[in-house]
């Protein structure tokens, strides 16, 4: 069953890519999606040093990345490794000049077998972290093949999530492969345990760590301070 599901997923991904490439001729947004990933492996190989050790962090968009900032800062303190950040959406990547906590920022190549193999071979991550709901089956398979540990943080699961519907057995199998899944609450833990997924720990939400970290920074905005001039504001 799992072999068939893996085959079916790989087939569907390739069909979806082909279909979207056709649609991209008429849709500017989808066209931009593919343009952003054009020559992605050349861009990566030109920027990174293969001799360095890497930690790979993947976030769907800027919001997910913002949650992970305190975690990334702690990783930088603990490991003398280069941190590679990937985004799925354009919202995060467009603001990469503001992102100082990581060493490299790239778009995530589409989750096809060939893309995953090329990407993991290039960056050879010491370990990888996926933020929130970023579960990409072919990347998981390739990380296992590479012998690299990988984790899901800020996980949130409900009993009626799509993970546990049509692709139930397939997705559950992939979730079991994570070295550890850190979830926001006990409800998520219960949902996963009922699906016989045991590699889970309740860690709370990264949002609170993000707020604590933000409070340590200089949050003054000079223009606003000048405008208010210590007046009371409602």
Regions found by a protein language model. Give the residues of each.
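Short, Lys/Arg-enriched N-terminal segments with co-localized hydrophobic residues
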Residues: 1-4
């Amino acid at each position: 069953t799992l072999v068939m599901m893996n085959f079916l997923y790989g087939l569907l991904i390739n069909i979806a890519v082909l279909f979207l490439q056709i649609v991209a001729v008429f849709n500017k947004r989808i066209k931009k999606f593919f343009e952003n990933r054009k020559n992605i492996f050349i861009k990566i190989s030109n920027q990174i040093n293969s001799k360095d050790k890497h930690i790979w962090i993947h976030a769907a968009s800027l919001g997910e990345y913002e949650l992970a900032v305190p975690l990334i800062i702690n990783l930088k303190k603990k490991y003398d490794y280069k941190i590679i950040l990937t985004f799925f959406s354009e919202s995060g990547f467009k603001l990469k000049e503001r992102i100082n906590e990581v060493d490299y920022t790239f778009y995530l190549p589409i989750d096809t077998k060939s893309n995953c193999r090329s990407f993991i071979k290039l960056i050879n991550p010491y370990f990888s972290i996926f933020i929130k709901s970023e579960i990409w089956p072919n990347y998981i398979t390739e990380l296992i093949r590479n012998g690299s540990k990988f984790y899901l943080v800020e996980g949130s699961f409900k009993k009626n999530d799509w993970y546990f519907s049509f692709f139930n057995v397939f997705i559950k199998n992939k979730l079991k492969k994570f070295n550890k899944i850190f979830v926001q609450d006990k409800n998520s833990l219960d949902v996963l345990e009922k699906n016989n997924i045991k590699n889970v720990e309740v860690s709370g939400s990264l949002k609170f760590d993000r707020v604590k970290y933000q409070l340590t920074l200089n949050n003054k905005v000079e223009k606003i301070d000048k405008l208010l001039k210590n007046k009371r504001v409602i």
